[in-house]
Amino acid sequence: MARQKKMGQNVLRAVFFLVLGLLGHSHGGFPNTISIGGLFMRNTVQEHSAFRFAVQLYNTNQNTTEKPFHLNYHVDHLDSSNSFSVTNAFCSQFSRGVYAIFGFYDQMSMNTLTSFCGALHTSFVTPSFPTDADVQFVIQMRPALKGAILSLLGHYKWEKFVYLYDTERGFSILQAIMEAAVQNNWQVTARSVGNIKDVQEFRRIIEEMDRRQEKRYLIDCEVERINTILEQVVILGKHSRGYHYMLANLGFTDILLERVMHGGANITGFQIVNNENPMVQQFIQRWVRLDEREFPEAKNAPLKYTSALTHDAILVIAEAFRYLRRQRVDVSRRGSAGDCLANPAVPWSQGIDIERALKMVQVQGMTGNIQFDTYGRRTNYTIDVYEMKVSGSRKAGYWNEYERFVPFSDQQISNDSASSENRTIVVTTILESPYVMYKKNHEQLEGNERYEGYCVDLAYEIAKHVRIKYKLSIVGDGKYGARDPETKIWNGMVGELVYGRADIAVAPLTITLVREEVIDFSKPFMSLGISIMIKKPQKSKPGVFSFLDPLAYEIWMCIVFASIGVSVVLFLVSRFSPYEWHLEDNNEEPRDPQSPPDPPNEFGIFNSLWFSLGAFMQQGCDISPRSLSGRIVGGVWWFFTLIIISSYTANLAAFLTVERMVSPIESAEDLAKQTEIAYGTLDSGSTKEFFRRSKIAVYEKMWSYMKSAEPSVFTKTTADGVARVRKSKGKFAFLLESTMNEYIEQRKPCDTMKVGGNLDSKGYGVATPKGSALGNAVNLAVLKLNEQGLLDKLKNKWWYDKGECGTGGCGSKDKTSALSLSNVAGVFYILVGGLGLAMMVALIEFCYKSRAESKRMKLTKNTQNFKPAPATNTQNYATYREGYNVYGTESVKI
């Protein structure tokens, strides 16, 4: 009896627990476990990890105030390009009896999935791009960007830009932009980049747009494609100041912007995940501690915004079923879930209740406030607007449906001109004599007082005119500014301006096209050109016959022939002119018949040569022409010798008192033709860029040599180049700006010199960042200083007044000095030679005369022994005398 009573109590207890279990299983028909589906594509690895982790977080952090239910999931992977794979994946989920499906779609799979959901009343929660179509049972976690984009386009006043869009994301934004373009007269160039596989095609598009002078781009793509486009932007160097890129993507911090930010371009984007949100911070703290093997792309990869949307989707699903549980809605699925391919389709009866509950959810997630309209689209959300600066990304404002775009107060970046009086302007410069130098006692000084030089004075004058406070900052890498061909990053002073580390550059910075593209220049404050510096050659030793140098050897030969010609003409004129003949004087006493008669004409051939030589030497002669014709010859010869001797005397003083240096090269052509003397330029400067870009044959040949020379002919600094010139013993030439060349030529040890003319013509300018309001004020200040003549005064002060080589010192190739024996040695040689020749001729004359006199004495003795009869025929004697005069063999009296 007792046993039967005990058995009855056990049965009642079993029935009680059975009823209790049934009540527990169905709180108003609500199950303990909610099964949800997951559809993932290939490139959603991190999103899959976030999906599983979010479910795990919910199951381990349930609200104890309500009867808990667990979330369970079934995951399928689909190939969006295969419609059978998409259908099979969805039907697999539906056959498992899932209450809702989370998943991704693209342009190819969207219609298939949404059609199944609408036909079978199965809710599909997705973080994929939103659609404008009014589809049922699709809950879109991703907010629409159309309104935010149009607001920013109006805020930045874009009237001409390029729109690069992904066709997989739909055409809704394209349509909205084109409608706005018609209303606002915008010039929009739209290009679809969704189907581009070759990265070279992106490059060609950017190059084409750049030829059209396009500087503004709106890029509407997923993160991966945006990264690819920006990579080509960096390669082409289109990420410098003046370019503006607006990224129509909700994951601004997911995009790789490290390389782009160094270019100076303005980059604007949108961010749906607020990293300052405590929920986000708490999630990330747990996220980074996950096991990478169980949750791929969790620990070592930053959290994507699509992963945050995935987490929020689980919150929405959980909140919807909590609501259904509170409302005691029966959502239990009993029996078979049915066939998704049945014809006609058999929808799930509780699907409408679940869809309605999902759309009624309002919860705070990692992406902010989450609400939906009647079509399952996000509403009442806020999107942060970010801007990328050289210092990093910053939040510039926010956008919502009611206030539109709201910029933060500090986003109104100070116009340099408006705030310049209240802040200290950073003036970047470079240590380069005589532009900027340390003072001798600079260690005892502070601030700008430590420096001196041309640019130091120029910066002071500009600041005085513009009325700004400034501090000088020496560029860290010691370079003027060039863009790296691989990274496209600017270095030197140009980089300081491009990346916002300086406000003005006052330095010997050459105005070039590539620099003008990224920074602004004032009018040139100094004109110059590329010049050649060589080591000053040794002074040439004067030759023995250097006194002949004032006249070319051709002139000396002409003078010799002219003298001979004049002598011959004078001889002939004297022969034919009757006024050059002497008349016989009958009153004279008869001479010795043995002595030769006096010649009646003094200008024989030897006397004519003597006359021309005496006139040329400006010493005169004891005979002169008597006839008019002879005097004409003498007059023109005297005039000729006057001009020649005067010119010779004028040049002789310069040639004998000036020491000349023979330069091995005189021009760039000389450098290009030879191989003994190496030549190079400053590395990373405008001079090197000039040769690299030049199309002139001579300069192309020089560039080909310089870039292949071993060891390298490029120097890091100008001082290194000058030192190399001085140590090379004339075997290295340095190509640099003419102003620097002239300055170094005036500095000790005065052993360099500038040769040839300038290879080009350019100027130094004061540089400011692109678009800086300081640019106009600085430009006006430079023009005013030029008109006042202050720029010339500064150059004279630092180039010549402080020169160390004297007036004209090292800057002159010729140096006047006292004559040395070597200058006039040839004259002494000729004197000694002439004296020796005279003594030799005198000896010959003496010997000849002695021999002739001996013969005459013998003849006289013979004559005395034989006395012939006196001459009776005087007529014959006269005839003899006349013939002697005409054909006489002697022209000089003895």
UniProtKB/Swiss-Prot annotation:
One function term, GO molecular function aspect: AMPA glutamate receptor activity
Residues annotated as binding L-glutamate: P508, T510, R515, S686, T687, E737
InterPro entries recorded: ANF_lig-bd_rcpt, Glu/Gly-bd, Iono_Glu_rcpt_met, Ionotropic_Glu_rcpt, Iontro_rcpt_C, Peripla_BP_I
Lipid-linked residues (S-palmitoyl cysteine): C621, C847
Residues in the bilayer without spanning it: 603-618, 619-621
Function recorded in the entry: Ionotropic glutamate receptor that functions as a ligand-gated cation channel, gated by L-glutamate and glutamatergic agonists such as alpha-amino-3-hydroxy-5-methyl-4-isoxazolepropionic acid (AMPA), quisqualic acid, and kainic acid. L-glutamate acts as an excitatory neurotransmitter at many synapses in the central nervous system and plays an important role in fast excitatory synaptic transmission by inducing long-term potentiation.
Other remarks on this protein: The postsynaptic actions of Glu are mediated by a variety of receptors that are named according to their selective agonists. This receptor binds AMPA (quisqualate) > glutamate > kainate.
Protein name: Glutamate receptor 3
Species this chain originates from: Macaca fascicularis
